Amino acid sequence: KIRIITKLDNPDWIILAVKSYDVANLIELLRNCSAPILCCQNGIKTYLQLTEKIGKDRIAYMVTGIGSSKIGTGKAEFRGSGFTFIGEASGVASPRLIDLSELIRKSGITCEVVDDVLSYVWLKTIINSSINPVAAHAKVVNGELRKPELNKIVHKICMESTMISTEIGINLPLEPWLEI
Protein backbone atom coordinates (compact mmCIF):
# COMPACT_ATOMS: atom_id res chain seq x y z
CA LYS A 1 0.00 0.00 0.00
CA ILE A 2 1.17 3.50 -0.80
CA ARG A 3 0.38 6.26 1.65
CA ILE A 4 -0.65 9.44 -0.17
CA ILE A 5 0.44 12.64 1.53
CA THR A 6 -0.69 16.18 0.84
CA LYS A 7 1.30 17.93 3.58
CA LEU A 8 4.99 17.62 4.39
CA ASP A 9 5.83 17.75 8.11
CA ASN A 10 9.42 19.00 8.34
CA PRO A 11 11.32 16.14 6.71
CA ASP A 12 15.15 16.19 6.67
CA TRP A 13 15.05 15.77 2.89
CA ILE A 14 12.41 15.42 0.22
CA ILE A 15 13.49 12.82 -2.31
CA LEU A 16 11.72 13.60 -5.55
CA ALA A 17 11.57 10.44 -7.66
CA VAL A 18 8.66 10.93 -10.03
CA LYS A 19 8.32 11.20 -13.78
CA SER A 20 9.36 14.61 -15.08
CA TYR A 21 5.83 15.42 -16.27
CA ASP A 22 4.59 15.10 -12.66
CA VAL A 23 7.01 17.67 -11.24
CA ALA A 24 4.91 20.69 -12.30
CA ASN A 25 2.00 19.35 -10.22
CA LEU A 26 4.22 19.17 -7.12
CA ILE A 27 5.81 22.63 -7.27
CA GLU A 28 3.34 24.28 -4.86
CA LEU A 29 3.58 21.46 -2.32
CA LEU A 30 7.37 21.60 -2.51
CA ARG A 31 7.45 25.39 -2.29
CA ASN A 32 5.41 25.33 0.93
CA CYS A 33 7.96 23.16 2.73
CA SER A 34 11.38 24.36 3.85
CA ALA A 35 13.20 21.02 3.52
CA PRO A 36 15.92 20.56 0.91
CA ILE A 37 14.92 18.56 -2.17
CA LEU A 38 16.99 15.81 -3.78
CA CYS A 39 15.71 15.42 -7.31
CA CYS A 40 16.32 12.04 -8.92
CA GLN A 41 15.55 13.03 -12.49
CA ASN A 42 17.17 12.78 -15.87
CA GLY A 43 16.79 15.93 -17.81
CA ILE A 44 17.46 19.60 -17.92
CA LYS A 45 13.84 20.80 -18.00
CA THR A 46 13.10 19.57 -14.47
CA TYR A 47 16.33 21.09 -13.17
CA LEU A 48 15.32 24.45 -14.62
CA GLN A 49 11.72 24.18 -13.32
CA LEU A 50 12.83 23.46 -9.77
CA THR A 51 15.64 26.00 -9.58
CA GLU A 52 13.51 28.77 -11.11
CA LYS A 53 10.35 28.13 -9.06
CA ILE A 54 11.86 26.99 -5.74
CA GLY A 55 15.41 28.34 -5.80
CA LYS A 56 18.89 26.89 -6.09
CA ASP A 57 19.45 26.99 -2.33
CA ARG A 58 16.99 24.11 -1.70
CA ILE A 59 17.62 21.95 -4.76
CA ALA A 60 20.12 19.10 -5.01
CA TYR A 61 20.28 16.68 -7.89
CA MET A 62 21.19 13.02 -8.20
CA VAL A 63 22.47 11.73 -11.52
CA THR A 64 22.96 7.98 -11.73
CA GLY A 65 23.95 5.33 -14.19
CA ILE A 66 22.39 2.46 -12.27
CA GLY A 67 20.68 0.31 -14.87
CA SER A 68 17.47 -1.66 -14.80
CA SER A 69 15.06 -3.12 -17.29
CA LYS A 70 11.32 -3.49 -17.15
CA ILE A 71 10.51 -7.20 -17.06
CA GLY A 72 6.78 -6.94 -16.50
CA THR A 73 4.05 -4.71 -15.14
CA GLY A 74 5.43 -3.10 -12.01
CA LYS A 75 8.59 -5.23 -12.16
CA ALA A 76 12.15 -4.27 -12.99
CA GLU A 77 15.41 -6.15 -12.98
CA PHE A 78 18.75 -4.71 -11.86
CA ARG A 79 21.16 -4.55 -14.82
CA GLY A 80 24.27 -3.07 -13.24
CA SER A 81 25.62 -0.16 -11.32
CA GLY A 82 27.40 2.78 -12.82
CA PHE A 83 28.11 6.25 -11.57
CA THR A 84 26.05 8.18 -9.02
CA PHE A 85 26.75 11.86 -8.51
CA ILE A 86 24.94 14.32 -6.27
CA GLY A 87 25.37 18.04 -6.02
CA GLU A 88 23.55 21.16 -4.98
CA ALA A 89 22.22 23.52 -7.62
CA SER A 90 23.91 26.36 -5.73
CA GLY A 91 27.28 24.79 -6.53
CA VAL A 92 28.27 24.49 -2.86
CA ALA A 93 28.14 21.15 -1.06
CA SER A 94 26.49 21.78 2.30
CA PRO A 95 27.05 19.60 5.38
CA ARG A 96 23.51 18.24 4.90
CA LEU A 97 24.43 17.03 1.39
CA ILE A 98 27.65 15.44 2.64
CA ASP A 99 25.61 13.62 5.31
CA LEU A 100 23.12 12.44 2.67
CA SER A 101 25.94 11.17 0.45
CA GLU A 102 27.29 9.14 3.39
CA LEU A 103 23.85 7.62 3.93
CA ILE A 104 23.65 6.70 0.24
CA ARG A 105 27.11 5.08 0.43
CA LYS A 106 26.10 3.11 3.53
CA SER A 107 23.20 1.67 1.51
CA GLY A 108 25.74 0.18 -0.91
CA ILE A 109 25.59 2.76 -3.69
CA THR A 110 28.80 4.45 -4.74
CA CYS A 111 28.10 8.17 -4.56
CA GLU A 112 30.30 11.16 -5.29
CA VAL A 113 29.49 14.75 -4.32
CA VAL A 114 30.16 17.21 -7.16
CA ASP A 115 30.17 21.00 -7.43
CA ASP A 116 28.70 21.53 -10.90
CA VAL A 117 25.78 19.11 -10.87
CA LEU A 118 24.20 20.71 -13.95
CA SER A 119 27.12 19.48 -16.06
CA TYR A 120 26.33 15.95 -14.83
CA VAL A 121 22.66 16.43 -15.71
CA TRP A 122 23.84 17.35 -19.21
CA LEU A 123 26.09 14.28 -19.32
CA LYS A 124 23.20 11.99 -18.42
CA THR A 125 20.91 13.75 -20.91
CA ILE A 126 23.42 13.20 -23.71
CA ILE A 127 23.81 9.54 -22.77
CA ASN A 128 20.04 8.96 -22.63
CA SER A 129 19.32 10.88 -25.82
CA SER A 130 21.95 8.82 -27.64
CA ILE A 131 20.80 5.41 -26.43
CA ASN A 132 17.05 5.55 -25.84
CA PRO A 133 15.68 6.56 -29.25
CA VAL A 134 17.90 4.10 -31.11
CA ALA A 135 16.96 1.22 -28.80
CA ALA A 136 13.26 2.13 -29.04
CA HIS A 137 13.30 2.49 -32.82
CA ALA A 138 15.23 -0.76 -33.32
CA LYS A 139 13.08 -2.48 -30.65
CA VAL A 140 16.16 -3.83 -28.85
CA VAL A 141 17.51 -3.77 -25.31
CA ASN A 142 20.44 -1.45 -24.68
CA GLY A 143 23.02 -4.25 -24.80
CA GLU A 144 22.14 -4.90 -28.44
CA LEU A 145 23.28 -1.39 -29.34
CA ARG A 146 26.79 -2.86 -29.51
CA LYS A 147 25.90 -4.22 -32.95
CA PRO A 148 27.98 -2.19 -35.43
CA GLU A 149 25.04 -0.82 -37.43
CA LEU A 150 23.29 0.46 -34.27
CA ASN A 151 26.47 1.50 -32.49
CA LYS A 152 27.34 3.79 -35.39
CA ILE A 153 24.02 5.65 -35.01
CA VAL A 154 24.38 5.94 -31.23
CA HIS A 155 27.90 7.31 -31.72
CA LYS A 156 26.75 9.95 -34.22
CA ILE A 157 23.96 11.15 -31.91
CA CYS A 158 26.33 11.25 -28.95
CA MET A 159 28.95 13.25 -30.85
CA GLU A 160 26.33 15.72 -32.11
CA SER A 161 24.88 16.25 -28.63
CA THR A 162 28.35 16.63 -27.12
CA MET A 163 29.19 19.25 -29.73
CA ILE A 164 26.00 21.18 -28.92
CA SER A 165 26.76 21.16 -25.19
CA THR A 166 30.27 22.47 -25.89
CA GLU A 167 28.90 25.19 -28.20
CA ILE A 168 26.62 26.53 -25.46
CA GLY A 169 29.37 26.51 -22.84
CA ILE A 170 28.67 23.33 -20.88
CA ASN A 171 31.90 21.85 -19.50
CA LEU A 172 31.09 18.14 -19.40
CA PRO A 173 32.77 16.33 -16.50
CA LEU A 174 33.25 13.06 -18.42
CA GLU A 175 33.37 12.06 -22.06
CA PRO A 176 29.80 10.90 -22.87
CA TRP A 177 30.84 8.37 -25.50
CA LEU A 178 33.18 6.64 -23.03
CA GLU A 179 30.33 6.42 -20.52
CA ILE A 180 28.05 4.75 -23.09
Spans of model-derived segments:
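Rossmann-like NAD(P)(H) cofactor-binding subdomain of soluble oxidoreductases
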Residues: 1-75
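Internal alpha-helical scaffold of NAD(P)-dependent oxidoreductase catalytic cores
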Residues: 33, 53-58, 74-174
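Short catalytic/ligand-gating loop segments at beta-alpha or beta-beta junctions
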Residues: 174-180
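Positions that flank functional sites
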Residues: 66, 119, 180
